[in-house]
Amino acid sequence: MADNNKMSREEAGRKGGETTSKNHDKEFYQEIGQKGGEATSKNHDKEFYQEIGEKGGEATSKNHDKEFYQEIGEKGGEATSENHDKEFYQEIGRKGGEATSKNHDKEFYQEIGSKGGNARNND
């Protein structure tokens, strides 16, 4: 406790947080999180989200190794496959192919085709 039997701001915040967590359930936190996200999205632009995403990605990459990314990728893939059907994958494959074709030329496809053929021959 701070001087004169007064709580510090930090102590008061911690106690308030503990009390709140005892009095509310998961749905409460989901609801206030959604409201906060909506309010934030109204106040910030695309660049803001790109910047915080980049900073978060850099911080995460410093704290995790290759196995971490393999594990979360596998979990994400499993969750996605449980929630989507064949048509979903056909659609995202088509969109990805279109985007790739806009960004690459004939030489790119010749190079990756050659690499794929070489890899297959080495198996």
Curated annotation (Swiss-Prot):
Question: Further remark, if any?
Answer: Glucose deprivation induces sporulation and several other adaptive responses.
Query: Which organism's genome codes for this protein?
Result: Bacillus subtilis (strain 168)
Please list where the region (5 X 20 AA approximate tandem repeats) is annotated.
Answer: 13-120
Q: Which UniProt keywords apply?
A: Repeat, Stress response
What single Pfam family name could you report for this chain, choosing any that match? KGG
Which residue intervals correspond to the sequence repeats? 13-32, 33-52, 53-72, 73-92, 93-112
Q: What is known of its domains?
A: Consists mostly of well conserved tandem repeats.
The region called Disordered is annotated at: 1-123
Report the function annotation for this chain. Involved in an adaptive response to nutrient deprivation other than sporulation.
Q: Where does this protein have compositionally biased stretches of type Basic and acidic residues?
A: 1-29, 41-109
Protein name in the entry:
Glucose starvation-inducible protein B
- Do you know what upregulates this one? Glucose or phosphate starvation, and addition of decoyinine. Also by heat shock, salt stress and oxidative stress.
